[in-house]
A protein has these predicted regions:
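Polytopic transmembrane helical bundles with strong interfacial aromatic enrichment
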Residues: 2-155
Length: 155
C-alpha cells in the first residue's frame, strides 16, 4: 500500500494579469528612478539641458508610482494577491512626492539622501516582485491528511 498527503486547502495565487501589471509598473518605476541620478550627473558635468530632463523625468516617475499603486491595489483585491505591495507602493508614492517637493525647493540636504532611499526601495521592490512565487496554502497551520490508497479513509 502507498500513502500520499492531501494538503488542507488549495493555495490562493494572484491572477496572472494582476501580477504581470504590477511587475511591469515596478520595473518601469525602477528604470525611471535609475535615470534620475544619471540626468542630474549630466547637469553637473555641464549639460544644462539635463536639469530640465531631470525635472520631466521626476514627473514621469511620480505618475508611474501612482500607476504602480493602482496596479498593487488591483493585484490585492480583485486579483487575490497579498496586501504588502499596496503598502510598499504607497510608501514609494509618498517618498516621491516628498522628493519632488524638496527638489523644487532646492533642499538638497534632504533631496539627495531621499533619492538614494527611493532607488534602494525600488531595487528591493523590483527583486521581490520578480522572485518566483512560492506554493503556500491558505491554511498553512492545518495538518495535512494522510490517505491510504484504496481505503478512502483519511488517517
Amino acid at each position: 500500500m502507498w500513502h500520499y498527503r492531501r494538503m488542507a486547502k488549495t493555495p490562493a495565487r494572484p491572477t496572472p494579469w494582476a501580477r504581470w501589471m504590477f511587475r511591469t509598473t515596478v520595473t518601469a518605476e525602477a528604470l525611471l528612478a535609475f535615470a534620475q541620478p544619471v540626468l542630474i550627473g549630466g547637469f553637473l558635468q555641464g549639460h544644462y539641458a539635463s536639469l530640465q530632463l531631470h525635472k520631466e523625468n521626476a514627473t514621469f516617475t511620480g505618475v508611474t508610482a501612482m500607476v504602480m499603486l493602482l496596479a498593487a491595489v488591483l493585484q490585492w483585491r480583485p486579483g487575490r494577491g497579498p496586501a504588502w505591495p499596496v503598502f510598499a507602493s504607497l510608501t514609494v508614492v509618498a517618498a516621491i512626492v516628498a522628493q519632488i517637493i524638496t527638489g523644487y525647493a532646492r533642499t538638497l540636504a534632504v533631496h539627495v539622501p531621499l533619492g538614494v532611499l527611493i532607488i534602494t526601495g525600488d531595487v528591493l521592490l523590483l527583486v521581490q516582485v520578480w522572485k518566483p512565487a512560492r506554493a503556500v496554502t491558505e491554511d498553512a497551520g492545518a495538518p495535512a491528511e494522510t490517505v491510504t490508497a484504496g481505503s478512502g479513509h483519511a488517517s
